[in-house]
Amino acid sequence: MKLNNSFFFMSVIFVFLIIIQFSTATYSKSEIEYYKRFGYNLETGEYTRSSPHQHQQQYQQQPQSRQRNRHNSRYGSERRSRQNPYNEDYYSNQNYYQQTSNDLDETAPVYKQGVSIPKNINVGISIDEVTPNVIVETNKPTFSQSLTKPTEKPTLPLKPSIEPTLPTTRKPVEPEPKKTLPPTTQPPETISPKSQTTPAITQHQISTPSPSQQSHHFFYGDGRPAGAGTDDKEEEETKTPTRTHKPINIDDDDDDDETKKPTRLNNNDNNKNNNHRNNNNNKDDDDEDEDEDENKNKNKNKGKPNIDDEDNDEDDDEPEETEEPTITGSIEEAKTPDPNLIEGYSSESDPSGSQSTHEDNLIATQSNSSGKISITFFSFIIFSFTIVFFLI
């Protein structure tokens, strides 16, 4: 009997808990009134009206008076939409567009002919209905003439004025540029620009031109014009040593014979150059002495900046070592990595790793906190069933 009583008692408690959770909750008056604004009744669970903005539709369906300002009637819904920025009726309601079209039609009558006449001005026109035919009184012929003149007169003079001008402008233009005349004038013109344009092209190019046509336009690097009474062999003799001598002197200051000997010259050219140097031995010796003195001074000075550069390199190396570590202390301490930094990244050294681990912990705690409610409920149910099972 005790087992049956305990089972009955536990089952009653379990059913009572379920009824409490799934029973209809009692809502406060503020919540009920809030949902009634949107047309939803919490007690019955039904919608009282179709749209949530009935107060605006009632305002729009009211008949508008003609004395109302046109500006307010046109932009009234826009002003209302500012109060309710999430107003769906502002984009979906058709009454807004109907109001604007009606207001435009009421301001001034627009007729089929495209003539709009205001109501307050008496022009002498009687209009019974909106028809394309306009009845004009005979008392004021000036206005009637103004209506007839622009329709009849402009059409008549335009036709003869346009037609004769077109053939007159077209006919004389065709015979003037005859096809037979241009070929007679063009061949000399085509030959002359070619002769003038080709030297302009060769000035930019380095290739040697023919001395017959373009000698007075082309100039060598020395400033001598091409074809000025000199043969091609003599030009090569003068050009080649200068061009081979310049790039060698840029790197080496020593005036040795081996450096000055051009490699691409004939034997005759070498003999001529050697004879020229033998005649000028005195000048070359003086130049060589000066060059040697300069080279000695340079060599002496070359050693000094090397020492300074080493010192500068040492100075430059020191700030690089100080800039790399962020931890305050000696350089050796900064170079040796800490075991703490290797095993688990700290917040200072690697914020991404620390944040990731911290966020994982937060997520785990949040999931546990959110799951506590469900776990307690299910644990209570399981605990109750286990007790009942063992009691039976």
Swiss-Prot record:
It is a multi-pass membrane protein. Residues 284-294, 308-324 have a biased composition (Acidic residues). Residues 192-216, 346-356 have a biased composition (Polar residues). It comes from Dictyostelium discoideum (Social amoeba). It is found in: Membrane. The lineage of its organism: Eukaryota, Amoebozoa, Evosea, Eumycetozoa, Dictyostelia. The chain crosses the membrane at residues 7-27, 372-392. This is Uncharacterized transmembrane protein DDB_G0283675. The keyword Ribosomal protein does not apply. Residues 46-90, 144-362 are annotated as: Disordered. Residues 49-66, 147-160, 266-281 have a biased composition (Low complexity). Keywords: Membrane, Transmembrane, Transmembrane helix. It comes from the Eukaryota.
